[in-house]
Amino acid sequence: MILGIGTDLANIERVEKTLARFGDRFRNRVFTPLEQARAERRADVAGTYAKRWAAKEACSKALGTGLRMGIAWKDMSVANLVTGQPVMELTGWAAERLAAMTPPGHEAIVHVSLTDDHPWAQAFVVIEARPLAAPPA
């Protein structure tokens, strides 16, 4: 069952200007060290940060809170599987909120999709509750 859906659109040029103006202050407030390391290795640094910004916004919407009620930017982190597929990792209050909204007997799965077409970066997040497998009889 679907527990939440969120989407966000971020302007890559705006993120680029914010990075130029605030630098590490912005990076350290919003992005985890892993996200920063990945972004700084990419050819399109601003685009990478913009997609992750959009993913965090979309995730906060899927959690039903937006960026309030104690949720912090770094409670949501985008990583990538070896295949390149993005995955959302939740910690802190975001993880607590996810646990609270997951029905008993289910596990929560956070699906994330990222795309960009300059100057836009877009993210979709779907939170699914999947029934836990019953133990064999």
Swiss-Prot record:
Q: Can you say where in the cell this protein is located? A: Cytoplasm
Q: Which cofactor does it need?
A: Mg(2+)
Q: Looking at the record's lineage, which domain of life comes first?
A: Bacteria
GO cellular component terms, semicolon-separated = cytoplasm
User: What Gene3D superfamilies does the record point to?
Assistant: 4'-phosphopantetheinyl transferase domain (3.90.470.20)
Alphabetical UniProt keywords: Cytoplasm, Fatty acid biosynthesis, Fatty acid metabolism, Lipid biosynthesis, Lipid metabolism, Magnesium, Metal-binding, Transferase
Q: What class of enzyme is it?
A: transferase
Q: Which residues bind Mg(2+)?
A: D8, E57
InterPro entries in the record: 4-PPantetheinyl_Trfase_dom, 4-PPantetheinyl_Trfase_dom_sf, ACPS, Ppantetheine-prot_Trfase_dom
Q: What is its EC number?
A: 2.7.8.7
**Biological processes per GO annotation:** fatty acid biosynthetic process
Question: What Pfam families does its record include?
Answer: ACPS
Which reaction is recorded as catalysed by this protein? Answer: apo-[ACP] + CoA = holo-[ACP] + adenosine 3',5'-bisphosphate + H(+)
A single GO molecular-function term is:
holo-[acyl-carrier-protein] synthase activity
Q: Which family does it belong to?
A: Belongs to the P-Pant transferase superfamily. AcpS family.
**What's this chain's function?**
Transfers the 4'-phosphopantetheine moiety from coenzyme A to a Ser of acyl-carrier-protein.
Instruction: From the Swiss-Prot or TrEMBL record, give the protein name.
Output: Holo-[acyl-carrier-protein] synthase
**What is the species of this protein?**
Cereibacter sphaeroides (strain ATCC 17025 / ATH 2.4.3)
Q: What is the lineage of its organism?
A: Bacteria, Pseudomonadati, Pseudomonadota, Alphaproteobacteria, Rhodobacterales
